[in-house]
Amino acid sequence: MLIEHLNRQLREREAQSLRRRRRIAETPCAPHQRVSLDGQTASEARELLAFCSNDYLGLANHPALIGALAEGARLWGAGAGASHLISGHTRAHAALEDTLAEWAAPNIPGAKALSFCTGYMANLALLTALGDAEATLFADKLNHASLVDGALLAKAKLQRYAHRQFDVLERQLAACTTPIKLIVTDAVFSMDGDLAELDQLLSLAERFDAWLVIDDAHGFGVLGPKGRGSLAHFGLRSERLILMGTLGKAAGLGGAFVAAHPSVIDWLVQSARAYIYTTAAPPAIAHALSASLALIAGDEGEARRQHLRELIAALRCQLAALIAAQPQLGWRLAESDTAIQPLIVGSNDSALALAAALDAQGLWVPAIRPPTVPVGTARLRITLSAAHSQADVTRLVAALATTARELA
């Protein structure tokens, strides 16, 4: 009965062009990768120009980080061996947390930091630990799935507001009667690339005695002076801020952290099940992240951010011209100044066909469909990396232009 039930649902997904399939990267994360399909051998792989990773600064295959990771393994071995609260919390983890609190969260007075294996786990831990029965969570409807799941698992009341509609949020806050209020938002929205107006949200938090929980997965390392992230980008400073950042995107490695008032961090240690009941990340990764943060903050990091900004501007300019020349296609480039550049095409079939046409021309750009994005807004999620070149961007737009002419 179970298998029949699952197969029926799989067929339904297939009919709606919603079935997901994995590819196998045969080479390290980089703009040019050899890629095979699930079921193929490595010898059948093709080289593709990829616009799909979140390696925004191009650090995932950086020699300095490879060396730091190898050094960390020599110093600390292959794994942590236990959870943080048993025997898995090493000096490497502690040093990373101290650095993150000081470097990534100077906007939060007296902040402490707590490291996690993934951003998903960090958000689940955060919202389930803070969102008890005395709390209300106010969440943007386009928040990342991990924030959605954390809010649903929490015992708190949940109120969602339309994307960046702060007049709605203001009315919800004004009507709230619970003693604890948490406004929860992405800083950079992962499927649209736009920024939440964090300054306005903090103003509402201060006005209504609420706390602002920020998922800076796609801003950390990229935005703000020295890549310190979205808090620095907006120049915010308040003890009402609770920051989650990931370390597997711009930082090039893996893991995540929460930075907040010391009492918030202590409460997570005491009660966050997604922190307590899982093995700590390998300490070698924590060791290597120190090298990553130094790169991000230094001259090389700034040069990479500047190059990334130039790539974003070039892509937007070229795509705008292409869309203007082919209005009958109905393509729309989302309003985004970040490395996430969504090309919205509408139907699931259209997005899949466009991705397949690019694949045939040697480009890897993923089609994103519901439920990840709203129905009718299927898209290509183009992501740029500082490891890309201007020639890579030109090649992508040329391939899209070729496909546009064929569709016309």
Swiss-Prot record:
Protein name per UniProt: 8-amino-7-oxononanoate synthase
The family database entries (PANTHER family) matched by this protein are listed as:
8-AMINO-7-OXONONANOATE SYNTHASE, CLASS II AMINOTRANSFERASE/8-AMINO-7-OXONONANOATE SYNTHASE
Q: What is its EC number?
A: 2.3.1.47
Binding-site residues for pyridoxal 5'-phosphate, renumbered to this chain: 119-120, 190, 218, 246
Q: What class of enzyme is it?
A: transferase
Source species, domain of life: Bacteria
**Biological role stated in the UniProt entry:** Catalyzes the decarboxylative condensation of pimeloyl-[acyl-carrier protein] and L-alanine to produce 8-amino-7-oxononanoate (AON), [acyl-carrier protein], and carbon dioxide.
A single GO BP term for this record reads: biotin biosynthetic process
Known cofactor(s): pyridoxal 5'-phosphate
Tell me the residue numbers annotated for binding substrate.
20, 144, 372
Record note on quaternary structure = Homodimer.
Please give the Gene Ontology molecular function terms for this protein.
8-amino-7-oxononanoate synthase activity; pyridoxal phosphate binding
Q: What lineage does the source organism belong to?
A: Bacteria, Pseudomonadati, Pseudomonadota, Betaproteobacteria, Burkholderiales
